[in-house]
Amino acid sequence: MKRARTVVLLVAAAVAGCGEPERPADANSRPPVLLRIGHVGHDHHLALYVAALEGERFLKDGGIGLKEVKAKEVYDLLEDGRAVARLRLLKVGGGSRMPAAMSRGEIDVGLGGTMPVAKFADGGQPFKIICPLQTDGDMLVMQKDSPVADWAGFVAAARSADKPLRIGYKAPVAVAKLVFEGALKAERIPYALDASDGDTRVVLVNFGSEKSPLPMMEIRAIDGFVMNQPGVAVAVDKGLGKVVAELRDLPPRGKWVNHPCCCVAATTDTLAKHAGPVKALLKVLLLSTQLIQQDQALAISCASRWTKYGLAVEKASIPTIGYVAEPTDTWMAGMATWAERVREVKLFTGKYADASPQQFVDDVCDLALCRAAAAELRAAGKLK
């Protein structure tokens, strides 16, 4: 009778457990830390997507990489055979949406624009830029049948046109807008957000950070737009515009070359609690950036696979973007240039309002983990 009761209890326990998820035999096999990673979904964040799509390559070659759990959503970050974190990738939107999501506690680490991150930090949010992602990749696009063919032609048209040129931009703190305004100022071309001033030669039109400028181009509500890739390549591919200038080449001469665009940012709480896993993540991004630099064809293929844009779009987009994951002297100088530029337009109204460029860079950036990650990879012969 006792034996029968034991059998019944075992069967009951088995039945009760039928709906339970399978548990790993070794509790240590589960990643100890969950990091929620916010991203936008376009090719400025290609380092993350290459890391995800080519995870097995990195694990085989370098002993560190991402193992897919759920495609495009969940990955285990492995280093030397040990799971150091589980990454949950969340598409949070561009412009100010990424730092806004971080401020609400929805993500721990975010990929997005340097200036939106800095603007939130200026307002008191405990955010730090911990790693570059890329530079450049911003363009001036005009209507396909516009007589404007280059920057000199744009300047001439702005000065001589019967009415102000209408140029779209995606967000007040968008990198492309800040560069474009700087170039207009250098050329002494009056611009404004409306045409109420008779001296205005360029009217800036906000088409929204999550909207495409293409509908406005199609109905000719704007004469052109300034924007980052791959939106530019999409417009050209659809026959709704032509590139007349890369913003890196605009005046003042040399000022915008290799300008910082997107970065990796994190909360100070995340950095304090999870420095090891974050450093491991940065190692993966450093290695994937190196692969992008070495194999552009692979980079284009990965971009198309992740973003779902056609190969033609990514073939036009990727070569115009500078992928960089280390804070080089050029990148640091570019951050100081941003500090000067945003001071001119009074973008900062909080703790950076009166900061010098060096004070701004020193406070908004915490690059210790990135530099440590790069040093460890080089010591192991994995990073050139």
What are the residue ranges of the model-derived segments?
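Pocket-lining segment of extracytoplasmic ligand-binding domains
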Residues: 115, 209-305
